[in-house]
Each structure stands twice: as C-alpha cells, then as structure tokens.
Amino acid sequence: MENFSEWYHNILETAGIYDLRYPLKGCGVYLPYGFKIRRYAFEAIRDMLDESNHDEALFPMLIPEDLLAKEGEHIKGFEEEVYWVTHGGTTPLDVKLALRPTSETPIYHMMKLWIKVHTDLPIKIYQIVNSFRYETKHTRPLIRLREIMTFKEAHTAHSTSEEAEAQVQTALNIYKTFFDRMGVPTIVSQRPEWDKFPGADYTMAFDTIFPDGKTMQIGTVHNLGQHFAKTFELEFETPEGGKDYAYQTCYGISDRIIASIIALHGDEKGLILPPEVAPHQIIIIPLLFKGKEEIAMNKAKEIYKSLKNTYRVKLDDRDIRPGKKFNDWELKGAPIRIELGPRDIENNKLTIYRRDTGEKFQIDEDNLLNELNTLIDSIENTIKEKAEQKVKSFITILDNHDVNNIKETLSTKKGVVLVPYDENIYTEEFEEEIDASVLGTTEYDGKKYISIAKTY
C-alpha cells in the first residue's frame, strides 16, 4: 500500500464507513455500514466486561468546573483541550460546565456517596459514551477527534492494593483477548513516568502499528493507587474498624479500534473485515441468466432463509450486473460471498469466494452449514496471522542505544525500534534526542526493552 493515508481516507468514504464532511473540524458521521462495524466491536467488549463482573452505568456529560478542578494534577494533563459551556441560553452560568473530556472526577464524586464500609467494595463499573477534546494537532478520522464518539471507560475501586493490582492484570487480559478477537496485534508497554496518565501510579498501554509504520495507542490501563481516592475522600471502614482509602484502577478504549481494524486488514481492493465485526458475514448473489431468473432467485432466497438465524447474511437482489456487486462487497470487506447460477443449482453446487485470500471454490449445497462453520474459523485465523506478520515486520531490535542508529532505523524501516533497557538513558532528554516517542518499557521474547516509535 503505497499511500496509506490516501487509501484510509478514501476507504472511509467509498466503503460507507464515516463521512468527514460535517462542518466542524475533528467531527464526523458514522454511516450505517460503519456504525454496524462499531456496534459489533463494542458489543464484544461489552460482553467481556459483563462476564467479568463489571456493571454498565451512565454518567452526565456536563462536569462543573469546580469538580473538574478538584484533582489538580489530573486536569493539568489536558486543561488546554477542555470544551466549556459558559451560557444557558443567553444567561451566563455562575459555574462553567466542561463537556466530558474523561470521567474520573464525576464518577469518583459519586463513588464517595456509595462507599462507606469494606463490604461496599469492590465496585467495577463502565460506560460507553462520547467525550470531547479540543485537539490542536492535525485531526484524523477515527484516530484523532475532537468528539470521540465511542469511549469505553471502566473504573474500579478496591479495599486493598493487591486487589487493585489484580484488577490491572484482569483488565490487561480482557484487552489482550479483545484485540486478538478483532485481529489487531499489539505491543504492550509500561509508559514512562513523564507520559503516564495524570494522577496514576503507572500506566500500561496497547499500541499497534499501521501500514505506514506509525504506531497508535489503542488502549490503556491505569493503576491509580489511592491518589484520586484521597482527593475525593473515598474512605471506608476496614474489617478491623479502622479507616482506609480505596485503591482504584481505570482503563479505556475508543473509536481507534475501528480505525485499526480498517487499517490492518485492508488491501488495494478495500476492506477485509473479521467475521466478528462484519455487518454482513455472508453475501448471496444469484446469477440471473435470461429466462432462468426465477430459478436462481428462488434458490438464493431459500439459502438466505436457511442461514439468517445463524449468520449475518444479506441477499443482494439489486438490479445491477453481478460484477458490480462483486466489486461492491469486496470493497466493503464482506468475508464470504456465495454465488449461484442455474448450472450450479442443477449440480447441487454453490460457488464460494473468501475475501481474505481471494480464493474461489465450489462446495456441495448439502454441506453448506458445515463448510461455513469451518470457513469462518479459517478466515478469522488467516486475518489474525496476516496482521501479526505485518506488525512483526515493523519491529526492529537493536543491541545499542546509538541515537543516529535509532533515527536511521526509524527513517528507513519505520515501525517500532526496541533497544535494551537502561535506566540511565530512559529519560525525556533521550526522547528529545531521538526525535521520536518513547512508548515505554516492553517485554519482548522474554527480555526487557525500551520501545521507540513515530506515533499518531
């Protein structure tokens, strides 16, 4: 893919995913097809959180200025990016209201009211909402937005530091599983002190590598210790009758997972969607030969009815040429296409096309369900393997910390450069010298490295 940026912007439009033409920088519109991809992706993470004893909640979008400012270190991290509501109609407000940049302060304000004794803990809640950041950098659709239209944030409170640390590991495992299901390989790093989440003890982050060699952060997990709990007075009575503050964690993902699915699995023909998030997993296209139209259409409807309760299937009965239909669904990344014409029907055969490999082959109609089950699994595995190979090809390991060598490697090979961990060079000054981002410390093949990359 020679020009990834151009390809990416084109595919958002031509595949019907996202419309950039909304008259406000950094804001766009999820089109129906893109919205379905989003829906199925976030249904997966919602199910995983529900299964791990998280409860979904919903907090207000508006945050009073005095509440947002209560945690000074936290707000310093993004105070220049906050949108403010200053009027109600034409009347100036006594207290400005922030449009939710993130929800620690309102959620923890409410947690104070809910937590009294140790038996009130743990609390594990999440919400999937929009959030707002006045991005001053170059905005990119689904990558860097002023209105993040899909922000999944989870917040937990525990009675001991050990429980909070265990929750961090649980969150990391949930995200690892989720990204694997989406076919998105990641590099997990502990962010450096100067780049951790404001107010956190430490931050773990998931990055992936796009086809242009730049990395993008697609998920974070934070151990907050007791920092926010002390600020917001999340105090509880211990089993011994004493007092202690809650230990907290939070973790989030956003629309960037949709951008990653698009970027990592696409090709020059268009999208290649994992079956789990494909709006239509199977497309049925009848080949209508003159005088035999009814035969093919009736069989197509019969197959559609037999599959619709098992798969997300669409019968494309548009009055256009089959070749145009083929191109449309290859562009949109539908995993499987079933073609059938009069001759196929006579021979009890169906022609199958799989988008990920471009293979076309015939199967017996009587064995359709078994073939599809096997095929779905094969497509998911192949998509994952190809993405893993792409990302791995962008990882370079160096045995030294030479600044010029690192710069040259980033320029020629792009991607992520791993250098041996050395606390003496693990500094902001080193980051400035190499003119790239230090992602953090990364375990790779059993060794500890400093990971470095150009980022979005």
Curated annotation (Swiss-Prot):
Catalytic activity: tRNA(Pro) + L-proline + ATP = L-prolyl-tRNA(Pro) + AMP + diphosphate
Keywords: Aminoacyl-tRNA synthetase, ATP-binding, Cytoplasm, Ligase, Nucleotide-binding, Protein biosynthesis
A GO molecular-function annotation: proline-tRNA ligase activity
Record-linked Gene3D superfamilies: Anticodon-binding domain, Bira Bifunctional Protein, Domain 2, C-terminal domain of ProRS
CDD domains for this protein: ProRS_core_arch_euk (cd00778)
Tree of life domain: Archaea
Domain notes from UniProt: Consists of three domains: the N-terminal catalytic domain, the anticodon-binding domain and the C-terminal extension.
Function description: Catalyzes the attachment of proline to tRNA(Pro) in a two-step reaction: proline is first activated by ATP to form Pro-AMP and then transferred to the acceptor end of tRNA(Pro).
Protein's UniProt name: Proline--tRNA ligase
